[in-house]
Amino acid sequence: MYLLVRMLCEGGLMIALALVLGLLKVFELPQGGSISLEMLPLLFFCVRWGMGGGFIACFAFGVLQVFIQGAVSWGWQSILLDYVLAFGVMGIAGLGRGKPHGIFWGSVLGGAARFVVHYISGITIYKILAPTEIFGTVFDNPALYSLIYNGSYVGIDLVLCLVIFGILYAPLKTYMTGACLLYTSPSPRDA
């Protein structure tokens, strides 16, 4: 029971931190997507607590982001894909839980999963926005457009997260891997 309460508290804090970081955008693209550090606390939580808690926290963040930050969308399908599902699948980063350097490869998995959902959204829903002419030549490739457009901001977000995790890895290794949870037990009066 103690660990469940702790996970819920940490999850709420990480979701709130992700929402605040999502408001602090370095750059915002015209059809949605921005460069920010909103993935950082979510990936951190996923790797610390695993896939179960990670999927729930990331899904909750995606839903809250629609209502708090607003959604750039072309209908309910793009809201479902670009917000709820794209962030929800980041919970796969929880596969890195308890593994050596799991924060890094777990983050890459989570970021890649998010990119795949944005990519699918780009080639199915946003293909109408793909340019028809580039450098004076005909361009009719929504798959390439989605790859470049979505890869530009998700890739930069992921690299920023990995750099910060690299800086924090040595001092926070026990916390990042969740090893401190193995040795934490409530005091007798908490039972």
Task: Identify the meaning behind each predicted range.
Residues 12, 55, 59, 63, ...:
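Residue-level signature of the transmembrane alpha-helical core
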Residues 18, 22, 118, 122-130, ...:
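Juxtamembrane/transmembrane-helix interface segments of polytopic membrane transporters
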